[in-house]
Amino acid sequence: MEYFNVGKIVNTQGLQGEMRVLSVSDFAEERFKKGSQLALFDDKDRFVQEVTIVSHRKQKHFDIIKFKDMYHINAIEKYKGYTLKVSKDNQGDLQEGEFYYHQIIGMAVYEKDVLIGHVKEILQPGANDVWIVKRQGKRDLLLPYIPPVVLNVDVPNKRVDVELMEGLDDED
């Protein structure tokens, strides 16, 4: 079965079995809602077990979650550093114009039909996502996912068309 990363357990939260998760999910509210099924993978990326979310809340930059049948810190402490993943079957349907992060990673980025590089990572620093584009012979480009910059995302052809605003590329 194919799985996709949605978060990393970075610490425990209190004594009642809550965990602090650093989300890398494109739809965190949906992904961590009560009843969601996720898979737990250890630090060597080996499947450990399926888990069910029983509670979720946001706190600063973290998602605080609790799993079914794990109601004490002693039951969850061993999972620090583990990765949470969603199976392909549990991803859910997308609306037109929406896509999953894993579909964007690796896409070729073009400006006026000139290849700039490939998306290697997606950050969620605040109001909008930032795509990190790996370029040949240059530093990585931080590309804000906003309409004036990202013009078209063609998932089937793995292509992104952009128009770099002045000041975005500090190496030009």
Swiss-Prot record:
MF terms (GO), sorted A to Z: ribosome binding
Single Gene Ontology BP annotation: rRNA processing
Subcellular location: Cytoplasm
Keywords, alphabetical: Chaperone, Cytoplasm, Ribosome biogenesis, rRNA processing
Alphabetical list of Pfam families matching this protein: PRC, RimM
GO cellular component terms given for this protein: cytoplasm; ribosome
Function: An accessory protein needed during the final step in the assembly of 30S ribosomal subunit, possibly for assembly of the head region. Essential for efficient processing of 16S rRNA. May be needed both before and after RbfA during the maturation of 16S rRNA. It has affinity for free ribosomal 30S subunits but not for 70S ribosomes.
Subunit structure: Binds ribosomal protein uS19.
HAMAP family: Ribosome_mat_RimM
Name assigned to this protein: Ribosome maturation factor RimM
Source organism (scientific name): Streptococcus pyogenes serotype M1
